[in-house]
Structure formats: structure tokens, C-alpha cells
Regions:
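Hydrophobic alpha-helical segments
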Residues: 1-165
Length: 165
């Protein structure tokens, strides 16, 4: 990724405003759903990691930290299966997120559906699927246009200052 986006989010809004507004509306609908906000953030962050979207990964790390999501969950999200810090419901959501994000690599089996259905009602599963769909949509805009990650100023300073031991 370069330091200069190919087009900025503001330019995207100018070029494809109706599309961006529709994605924002879908994002808001998911945010207002019955899914727990923390679970929604984990889903957004995991899909963004898989898709290699620096902007969305950093954005959702910032939001997750602001919400107070435990640091071990954020630190170990990429290895959630082995981490031992996620609930069974979170693990089911993360597995579903990975399946839907990598849909071109495999189909979703009856076993996959049964596994996630143990932890989510049909209504919740519909919203979980919508959450995965919308973050994948954002990733497919922000990653190829190389939106600059929203790195917080204090984080930048910490990188450039030696750690005090």
C-alpha cells in the first residue's frame, strides 16, 4: 500500500455517491440490529484482516479499543481457534465470517450451517450474514483504492518513541 490513496473516500463519494449512501444505510441497519456491538466489531475486523484491507482493519481496531473490547481478543483474533479467549458464540460467528468472506474457495455446507445455527437464531443469522456482506463490500472499496489507515496520533508517537522498560 502506498501513502497516497488511488482515490480518496471523499472522491469515491463524489463518483459513486448513491452506491456509498446505500452501503452506509446497510451498515446502519446492521449496527441497529440485535447483534451485540462487540460481536459486530469482531466480525468486521476479522473479515478486514482476511481481505487485507489496511483501512478497515485499523478503523475497526480503533473502534474496538474505544468500545473497550479486551486487548487479548483483538491481539489474537487472527488465531481465534487456538486463542482460548472467545466464547462459543463468538467462535461460531468468526467461523461463519470466514466461510462467507472466502465463499469463492468453498461452499457453505449443511454442517457449517448447523454449527452456526447452534448459537444464532434464524433472525440473528440473517443479520450476521448481512454484517459479513457489508464489511466485505467496504473492504472491496477501501483496499483496491488504498485508503490510508486511520492511525491515531498517539499510536504514531508510540511507534517513534523508544519504549520505557
Amino acid at each position: 500500500m502506498s501513502n497516497n490513496p488511488r482515490i480518496t473516500s471523499k472522491e469515491f463519494q463524489g463518483y459513486a455517491g448513491a452506491a456509498q449512501n446505500a452501503i452506509v444505510a446497510l451498515s446502519q441497519a446492521v449496527a441497529n440490529s440485535s447483534l451485540e456491538p462487540e460481536l459486530q466489531q469482531l466480525v468486521k475486523l476479522r473479515a478486514s484482516q482476511i481481505n487485507g484491507c489496511a483501512f478497515c482493519t485499523q478503523l475497526h481496531l480503533n473502534e474496538s479499543r474505544h468500545m473497550g473490547i479486551a486487548a487479548p481478543k483483538l491481539d489474537l483474533l487472527a488465531v481465534w481457534r487456538e486463542a482460548g479467549v472467545f466464547s462459543e458464540r463468538e467462535k461460531a460467528a468468526l467461523a461463519w465470517t470466514e466461510l462467507l468472506t472466502r465463499l469463492s474457495e468453498h461452499h457453505v455446507s449443511d454442517e457449517d450451517y448447523a454449527a452456526v445455527s447452534e448459537y444464532f437464531t434464524p433472525n440473528e443469522l440473517a443479520w450476521l450474514s448481512a454484517a459479513v456482506a457489508v464489511i466485505n463490500t467496504w473492504n472491496r472499496i477501501a483496499a483496491p483504492f488504498q485508503y490510508a489507515p486511520p492511525i491515531l496520533r498517539h499510536a504514531i508517537q508510540a511507534v517513534h518513541e523508544p519504549a520505557q522498560v
